[in-house]
Amino acid sequence: AGDEPVKAPMPGNILDVKVKVGDTVKAGTVLCVLEAMKMENEIPAPKDGKVAQVVVTKGATVGAGDTLVVLA
């Protein structure tokens, strides 16, 4: 299947990262929380998989389309 990057839907700040490398996640599991325009947006896993890479850290600023987490 290959690795699938989970990207930021909008620019914002990472308030929290809920997963670590090696975690097994189900579709819909919250991977991280992105604050944009004073709203907290939970970023869900698009599919079942394993966390291959966590690109962002808490407090990081991201742009729209930036990779947050990579699922395998």
Residue ranges, per PLM feature:
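Structured functional modules or segments
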Residues: 1-72
